[in-house]
């Protein structure tokens, strides 16, 4: 059975490795990215071409995949004059692997449906290294029939593919997960900063906290930076702040409010404003050690 032709937009660390995995598995691809070196690397492997526009990419593709930074970028690529919506084929499926605003995802899905195309939101867990080997965690959502249509491809990209229900549930779940994780990291980083300011040994604090129910991989990441000066949680303050902002917006769309998320976002934003945007989230420890009332 012939494999579907895939259009892939977004060749950052994660996207580039996802594309390499698809190429190794014999898929024909049409790709786009602002980074022409990344595009050239993909094309040099064979079985891939560069599309001149999102419209052209959609016209060539059975499945269109996004691995992009923000909802705003996704909307621009979908709705632009030479955008995906202008070229999408009837029966094609769009998959958004990024972390996007659920209401935006639902709107795009509705507009694609009017063209006879489907949509799956499928945000990712794990790292670019996992992407290269097809071992991602994929949180997929959308119409069940559409999901089953693309599941064979998702299974070649993910070790664990979760089906979460209607369109938007994947992005909702990812935002909840990131809200919980980043709030935990920010709180633990301040705990280690408080210990330093008070003259309490950070290693001893970790030994005590990690022997109880607060222990978690996130605590270890925070301890690695605050105590061992090793920054190994590969997620930037800028990205965390973006996701917290999306979570706050999602809660507003749901008719409620999260003061906890707003407080976490406020600390991340202040660290961002201080020039720490590209630092890994546990490095917010440095911001807390310098914070004055």
What do the PLM-derived regions correspond to, one by one?
Residues 99-178:
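Rossmann-fold dinucleotide-binding core
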Residues 171, 215-281:
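Interdomain hinge/lid region at the active-site interface
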Residues 203-210, 262-266:
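Beta-strand segments within the central parallel beta-sheet cores of soluble alpha/beta enzyme folds
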Residues 54-66, 70-117:
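Rossmann-fold NAD(P) dinucleotide-binding segment
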Residues 134-141, 162, 166-198, 207-221, ...:
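Active-site-proximal catalytic alpha-helix in oxidoreductases
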Residues 1-59, 63-67, 97:
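NAD(P)+-binding Rossmann beta1-loop-alpha1 motif at the extreme N-terminus of oxidoreductases
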């Amino acid at each position: 059975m012939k494999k579907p032709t895939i259009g892939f937009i977004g060749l950052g660390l994660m996207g580039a490795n996802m594309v390499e995995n698809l190429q190794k598995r014999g898929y024909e691809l049409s790709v786009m990215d602002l980074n022409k070196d990344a595009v050239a690397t993909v094309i040099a492997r064979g079985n891939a071409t560069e599309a001149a526009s999102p419209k052209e990419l959609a016209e060539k593709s059975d499945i269109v995949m996004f691995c992009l930074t923000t909802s705003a970028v996704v909307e621009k690529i979908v709705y632009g004059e030479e955008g995906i919506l202008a070229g999408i084929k009837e029966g094609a499926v769009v998959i958004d692997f990024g972390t996007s605003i659920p209401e935006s995802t639902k709107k795009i899905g509705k507009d694609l449906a009017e063209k006879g195309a489907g949509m799956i939101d499928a945000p990712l867990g794990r790292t670019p290294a996992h992407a290269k080997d097809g071992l991602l965690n994929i949180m997929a959502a959308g119409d069940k029939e559409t999901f089953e249509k693309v599941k064979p491809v998702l299974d070649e990209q993910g070790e664990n593919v979760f089906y979460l229900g209607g369109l938007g549930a994947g992005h909702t779940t990812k935002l909840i997960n990131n809200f919980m994780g980043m709030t935990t990291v920010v709180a633990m980083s301040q705990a280690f900063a408080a210990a330093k300011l008070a003259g309490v040994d950070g290693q001893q604090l970790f030994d005590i906290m990690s022997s109880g129910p607060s222990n978690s991989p996130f605590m270890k990441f925070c301890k690695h930076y605050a105590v061992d000066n090793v920054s190994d949680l590969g997620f930037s303050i800028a990205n965390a702040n973006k996701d917290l902002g999306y979570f706050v917006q999602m809660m507003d769309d749901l008719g409620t409010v999260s003061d906890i998320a707003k407080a976490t976002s406020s600390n991340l934003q202040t660290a961002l404003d201080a020039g720490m945007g590209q630092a890994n989230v546990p490095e917010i420890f440095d911001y807390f050690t310098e914070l004055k009332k």
